[in-house]
Amino acid sequence: RDRLRSRGLGDVYKRQFLYIEQTEAMAVIDVNTGKSIGKKNQEAHIKKINLEAAKEAARQIRLRNLSGIIMIDFIDMKSKDDEKELLQVMQNYLNGDSKKAVAVDITKLGIMEITRKKEKNPIFRQISIDILK
């Protein structure tokens, strides 16, 4: 399990983390807010954090060469329109990828499903193979 302090979340959002875990079946990214969500404008804060986390998640997907099934557990949003916007924003970030990647949908549990074409092993697998040689 890899905890990554997200960059680019702004001074207001200093305690957000992305937890990234790779298994044989899929990669899972969990967006964790820490204690940064206040009581005022909570939905606006959640939306902003999720949009920034989507940008960093797309970056990490490319850097770590994650592929196959990728699930992202964003912070739950009440608005279906906000979920649709998040899905579209993520697809826009994925469109800049050299490998075909598709933000498929957001499940009833609020988890975004992504597929990304597998061409090489993810970076963690490449490193572990090199160590074993």
For the regions a language model picked out, list residue spans one by one.
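Single conserved hydrophobic/aromatic residue that forms the stacking wall/gate
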Residues: R1-Y13
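Conserved glycine-centered short motifs in functionally critical loops
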Residues: R15-K133
